[in-house]
Amino acid sequence: MLMIMLLLAPMLASAHNLQLHQRVAPIGVSDKGELDYVDNKFSYKGWNSAQLGGKVRVVQHIAGRTSAKELNDPLIEAIKAAKLPHDRYQTTTIVNTDDAIIGTSIFVRNSIEDSKKEFPWSQFIVDSNGNVKKAWDLQPKGSAIVVLDKEGKIQFAKDGALTPQEVQQVMEMLHQLLK
């Protein structure tokens, strides 16, 4: 019992409303939204959290600032190195450009577009109004990680930087969910 409490402690300490074995709170992003890259052209379309089922996912919600991106970079690097199967796994990165340093939003969007070119199988959502942060009750200037099973149910959630042990836990969980 103590071990379970210790494992859950980081999740209990966060203010977010992401509950294990439930779906994320429903939210849509219509201003910008999901970034597409087809025929060397970028476009945006509306996105809704109801679209998160169908694949095992890591959803990374980050403020539109370098310091937030760096918080969970060790997990993202571990995911890249694992070469997870694109037909059954997807990383969904939601960038809150409403929480960017004033005057940097265009640079943030350019960085997201570069990432989409490099990782076309990944999903990038640009949230210009901070709708997802508000709906999920996430901390400002931060980074949250949510692991979803293929039904879209939360298996892990933390608002803040993951410890090395949590990175390992998430990677082991992803491999289990993909079996």
PLM regions with names:
Residues 27-56:
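A short beta-strand-turn-helix
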Residues 141-179:
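Thiol-/selenol-based redox modules, centered on thioredoxin-like
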Residues 90-94, 106-139:
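Short, internal strand/loop/helix patches
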Residues 10-14:
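N-terminal signal peptide c-region/cleavage motif recognized by signal peptidases
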Residues 64-67, 97-101, 129-132, 154, ...:
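Solvent-exposed loop/turn segments at secondary-structure junctions
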Residues 15-24:
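Cleaved targeting-peptide boundary
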Residues 1-6:
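Sec-dependent signal peptide recognition
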Residues 60-115:
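Structural microenvironment flanking redox-active thiols in thiol-disulfide oxidoreductases
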